[in-house]
Amino acid sequence: MSEATEVSIELKDIVQEYPGKEGAGVLRVVNGVSFKLERPSIVMLLGPSGCGKSTILHMMGGVRPIGVQTPTSGSVLIDGKPCSEAHDDVVMVFQRYANRPDLTVEDNVSFPFRLKHWRKRVAAAEARSRVDATLKAVGLDGHRKHLPSQLSGGQNQRVALARALVLRPRILLMDEPFGALDAQTRTEMQTLLSEMLLSNPCLVVFVTHDVTEALLLGDRVITLSAQPAVVADDFSILEPRPRSALWQRSSEALKMEERILAQLHAASPGRGSLRVSV
């Protein structure tokens, strides 16, 4: 296992507002969210669809919409320092895997090392070694010369995950990365992520609206209410990963599921939607 590096992200009283439609005031999406994330772990940011989860994740990644102050108020701190733009230690993975269609699997994974910033930080030999090891780890070593169009959706998401992990990020932000995959492929990717993080430990913030996924992957689950989002619940899961199907049917897991659904119903009755996988 790689040596884990301590890292922290802190949100302090985050408020996010956007201009309303046709000049009708403002739309408050996030309403005073605060939490601190520390040490390598998987933190699940769970909430109903459209509640503001992705907005919060993008703030952590320094993604700022043009013409809108982000956040409207409050602050995002990485290792105790204000962060208002893209950060060297932060890498993002999206539901749309954004692989370049004209590049092979190998070239997509190694693409960051073409950029001047990463060429300075990682020697060419080390970059090649990382790419080779990561392709093997995600099960794509035999597909390295294939184009994205020749791959399945799950394989394309493996490419995106490999491209992120090859940079050895201290913080990995994942915006519903497996949400568009079929149930079997989603389960395979969840297992792969857990296994990959054993040898590449980092702080993962994973956005989902799937309660089952949150309980399967999370070391900590932060539940947000419907818009405007507030923190409805925040708890840790001590069961080691990867978690078995038997544990998922245990009384402990079922009580956690009931807790999440009850907290969300109390915080935002009848608004937004969650998924419970079967």
PLM regions and their residue ranges:
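The feature captures the beta-strand-to-loop junction immediately N-terminal to the Walker
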Residues: 46-48
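Helix-to-loop junction immediately C-terminal to a conserved catalytic motif
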Residues: 61
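Short coil-to-helix segment of the ABC ATPase nucleotide-binding domain corresponding to the Q-loop/switch region
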Residues: 103-112
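ABC nucleotide-binding domain "signature" region
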Residues: 126-138, 259, 263
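Conserved ABC ATPase signature
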Residues: 147-151, 155
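Hydrophobic anchor residue at the start of the ABC signature
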Residues: 161
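A short, proline-enriched helix->beta-strand linker immediately N-terminal to the Walker B motif
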Residues: 166-170
